[in-house]
Amino acid sequence: MQLKRVAEAKLPTPLGDFLMVGFEELATGHDHAALVFGDISGKTPVLARVHSECLTGDALFSLRCDCGFQLEAALTHIAEEGRGILIYHRQEGRNIGLLNKIRAYALQDQGYDTVEANHQLGFAADERDFTLCADMFKLLGVDEVRLLTNNPKKVEILTEAGINIVERVPLIVGRNPNNEHYLDTKAAKMGHLLSK
């Protein structure tokens, strides 16, 4: 186990009350969170989303990506279902950090795509560690999920880490003229499944 469960509190939202659970990485002290809606116990697979932190999309409403749209849609789906989990994976910018993400945006403004921009900065296309998320599911007592994602790599890594993904639920929202090239690049170079 790479994390420990350290705190929890009620989080009232326009969609209803979630339980916010805080986790801490044992090696680094970095924190992550999960929003739990309803009763996630029992044998029925839980609707879940692993959402990687995106300050620009989630909080600042950027149109450069689909992250904020996905966050809102995932929470709505979970609330409508009556039970589920959203893991808020605190690895900003596919885990290159906010400052490098801003640098990558500047490179994209010069014509690089999102993958090329990461490479120009010395990073892989995706630096995230989804095994942490598998540990969060386990600490919540969940090992079977219906995963809201377009990323087959996320499914593969979580499965290898012991989470049974019984269904991949597409989450295709937020396409606009500002992020078309970004989404096309994610499909072409990173294998994301973005066609309905």
Curated annotation (Swiss-Prot):
The active site is at D126, R128. GTP binds at R49, V50, H51, S52, E53, Q70, E92, G93, R94, T114, T149, K154. It is an enzyme of class 3 (hydrolase). GO terms for molecular function: GTP binding; GTP cyclohydrolase II activity; zinc ion binding. Zn(2+) binds at C54, C65, C67. Pathway: Cofactor biosynthesis; riboflavin biosynthesis; 5-amino-6-(D-ribitylamino)uracil from GTP: step 1/4. It catalyses: GTP + 4 H2O = 2,5-diamino-6-hydroxy-4-(5-phosphoribosylamino)-pyrimidine + formate + 2 phosphate + 3 H(+). It comes from the Bacteria. SUPFAM superfamilies: RibA-like. Its EC number is 3.5.4.25. Transmembrane segments: none annotated. GO terms for cellular component: cytosol. InterPro entries: GTP_cyclohydro_II, RibA, RibA-like_sf. One of its GO terms (biological process) is riboflavin biosynthetic process. Its cofactor is Zn(2+). Keywords: GTP-binding, Hydrolase, Metal-binding, Nucleotide-binding, Riboflavin biosynthesis, Zinc. The keyword Ligase does not apply. Binds 1 zinc ion per subunit. Gene3D superfamilies: GTP cyclohydrolase II. Homodimer. Belongs to the GTP cyclohydrolase II family. HAMAP family: RibA (MF_00179). Catalyzes the conversion of GTP to 2,5-diamino-6-ribosylamino-4(3H)-pyrimidinone 5'-phosphate (DARP), formate and pyrophosphate. This is GTP cyclohydrolase-2. It comes from Salmonella typhimurium (strain LT2 / SGSC1412 / ATCC 700720). The gene is ribA.
